[in-house]
Amino acid sequence: MEKNLPKCWQTVKDCLENGIDRLILFGPPGTGKTFAGLHYGNVSAGAHRLVCTDDMTNADVTGTYIPSAGDWNWQYGKAIKAWEGDGVNGGRLVVDEIDKAGGDVFATLLSMLDSPESASWENPETGRVHRPRQGFSAVMTTNIEDMRELPDALIDRFPVRVRIDQPHPDALQRLSPDLRNVASRMCDAGDRRISLRAWITFDDLRASVGKERAAEILFGDRAESLIDAMTIDAI
């Protein structure tokens, strides 16, 4: 293992750098799951991100016509772009918050995340049949904790699931040294959790208004206890 790399991140690294092409990263928000999906492993053929929402449509996944200079041009969706990669090798598809995908979109994603031998999509306008190129991989992220909340069909396609319970060490380096331990602990503190983004904002703000005022602004009635925790860590 690399020095100072938490177990969850070492697992992600081992998977994506050694041929695991279907991976779910789950756990509290703000830990770097999306960043890992976009950058870990071989992404030389490109990485494409979808963020699932209730109003997302299949056009975001497969493509649609868009107006351009008085005409209509076909623009492929993120999944097809990931399938095609660089034209020789498939790229990476990162689907954020997969649990928020609507029914139609979810069904389309499932079909596109089937085995390479079975997955295909026909462009309804041109009749061209697309299939994932060799090397295509997919990473799903979700903030839910219980994988039983995800449909069985998705779980079947993604046998490897890693809970990310700590910020990546590289992300923690953005914080001043005195904040890194407490920020790492609070990332996975259940209902009391504080995101890494909030700590970064606090770090920036305290430089101008002082730590007490910055804590009051960012953390409200928890400010005093968090300042105490920072003080203890500094000892």
What are these model-predicted stretches?
Residues 1-235:
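C-terminal regulatory/interaction module of P-loop NTP-utilizing enzymes
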